[in-house]
Amino acid sequence: FIKDDELMANPPHSPFDERVDAIMRIINAHADRTGKKVMYAFNVSDELDAMQRHYEKIVSAGGTCAMISLNSVGLAGAKKICDLGALAIHGHRNGWGMLNRHPLLGIEFSAYQKLWRLAGVDQIHVNGIANKFWESDDSVVRSMEACAKPLLGGMSVLPVVSSGQWGGQAPETFRRTKTVDLLYMAGGGIMAHPNGAAAGVRSLQKWWEAAVEGLTMESAAAKYPELNISLDKFGKKSG
């Protein structure tokens, strides 16, 4: 899974249609070669008519996912895109801090996520353990648990774990949630790996293997010495 940045919609320096063509050319070629198609979430956030055009561009190019900035497009905009039905919908909650950071303002995530699930989103951001923002680990865990609860007898929504993630948080994330039914998103944790992006991806996979084995960050690094590369690079921020 790969996604656009939530601030990257249709700017002059990266026009939406050109970006879709460039990225899907690589993804489709990779799928033809390997039989595995990477899901890429293109950020369609815009006015309603433009969002629908962006959505149709993804479909015609062979894409599988559209991203919307929930707090920017609103419930009506989100439902309009979700109702089109051809793509998975990745819901980004950028701007969430203004709705929840102060205890006397806004809405609790357990209620917030229900609104977007009713609109039809398939994936929704929940922050992450030992994240780079203000939110506590306890709050993140509550958010993940809320996503796992069936709504109106239906399906759950996939929590998207992100924000300063590099792999070392995986053991604590799994210890506290006991699930691998999530998207674990890392930007710098992959791209800034000392041995390159491919090594960054392999490192995340190995950290999660260790997490499911029940290892702590320290015991994982002891059992799998290659994990010390990311540990030395990104520090011991694990939860």
Spans of features found by a protein language model:
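Glycine-rich, proline-tolerant flexible connector loops at the mouths of alpha/beta enzymes
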Residues: 2-20, 128-135
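N-terminal active-site wall of soluble small-molecule enzyme domains
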Residues: 18-19, 23-38, 42, 46-59, ...
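Short beta-strand segments at enzyme active-site cores
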Residues: 2-5, 37-43, 68, 125-126
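Catalytic alpha/beta core domains of metabolic enzymes, predominantly
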Residues: 53-55, 61-186, 199
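Flexible, glycine/charged-enriched surface loops at secondary-structure junctions
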Residues: 4-5, 33-37, 214-222
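Ser/Thr/Pro-rich, acidic low-complexity intrinsically disordered regulatory segments
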Residues: 103, 229, 234-239
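Glycine-rich beta-strand-to-loop/alpha-helix junction loops that act as flexible
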Residues: 5, 40-45, 161-165, 186-188
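C-terminal helical cap(s) of enzyme catalytic domains, especially alpha/beta-barrels
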Residues: 16, 21-24, 77-88, 133-148, ...
